[in-house]
Structure formats: C-alpha cells, structure tokens
Swiss-Prot record:
Origin: domain of life: Bacteria
Known role: Regulates arginine biosynthesis genes.
Pathway in which this enzyme or protein is active: Amino-acid biosynthesis; L-arginine biosynthesis [regulation]
Name the UniProt record assigns to this protein: Arginine repressor
Localization: Cytoplasm
Organism: Actinobacillus pleuropneumoniae serotype 7 (strain AP76)
Taxonomic lineage of the native organism: Bacteria, Pseudomonadati, Pseudomonadota, Gammaproteobacteria, Pasteurellales
InterPro entries (UniProt xref): Arg_repress (IPR001669), Arg_repress_C (IPR020899), Arg_repress_C_sf (IPR036251), Arg_repress_DNA-bd (IPR020900), WH-like_DNA-bd_sf (IPR036388), WH_DNA-bd_sf (IPR036390)
Disulfide bond positions: none
Family matches, as SUPFAM superfamilies: C-terminal domain of arginine repressor, Winged helix' DNA-binding domain
Classification via NCBIfam families: argR_whole, PRK05066.1
Amino acid sequence: MEKLDKLSEAFKALLKQEKFGSQSEIVTALQELGFENINQSKVSRMLSKFGAVRTRNTKMEMVYQLPAELGVPTTSSPLKNLVVDIDHNDVLIVVKTSPGAAQLIARLLDSMGKSEGILGTIAGDDTIFITPTKVTPVEVLMQNVTELFESSF
C-alpha cells in the first residue's frame, strides 16, 4: 500500500473514532501513528477532500466526522429530514439545517449547479446561503429548493 493510501486510511480511521475536536489533535494522532511529516495545513486539505464536518458526537462534544455517505448525496437520502427552514429575500435564499448538516446539504446544492439556477452556496454549521444565477429569479429558485426537500415551508 502506498504511503498516501496508508495516510488516508489512518486519517479516516481516526475520524471514525469521533473524538478529535481540533486539527492539531488530528496532527498529533497521525504523528503518533508514524506520519512524521504531517502538519495542520495537510490535515485541513484532507478534511476538505473527504468532506469532513464538525458535529456533535454522542457525548455532545464538537468533533470532526466523515459524512455518512461519500460521493454526491442524493435527495433519496435522509437529507431532507435535516432541513429545518427555508427563507429568502430579494437576493438570496437561506436554508437552516440541523447542527452539522449544512455543509453536506450545500454539497448537494452545489452539485446541481448553474443549470438549476444556483450560482453558489456558502455553508456554516447549520446555515446555508444560496445565491441564484443572474437569470433565475430568487422566488423560482426558492420554489425549486423547497421542492427538492419535499417540505412545506
């Protein structure tokens, strides 16, 4: 197994433990496993690459965790259950989610792209801002996003 593959496997195994609340804790754990050249910026890139998000574990601690499913999430997954509210103003749409779910849902919305009227998204822990393309009225995109999650907001 290549060194990069071993690093990826070790990284995923550590995140599955759901006990690392900071990137420096992950760096230390990987160094203890023999990856001496690991640093915070590499860990940050790996967190992004694997779509990891900070969420609460069973002890209610904020920890890094891998998404339940890798790849592009679909609307057949229980993501729609994570959407709490959808609202808009004249220029953008705001989606409120359960804590820790915004980045995963934003990934789904970003994968839809400009053809569906989405110029881009910005996601925090539990809030997503959606900017429509120039040619898509915000009300139309609001309706499309609402229908996507089969909710009655």
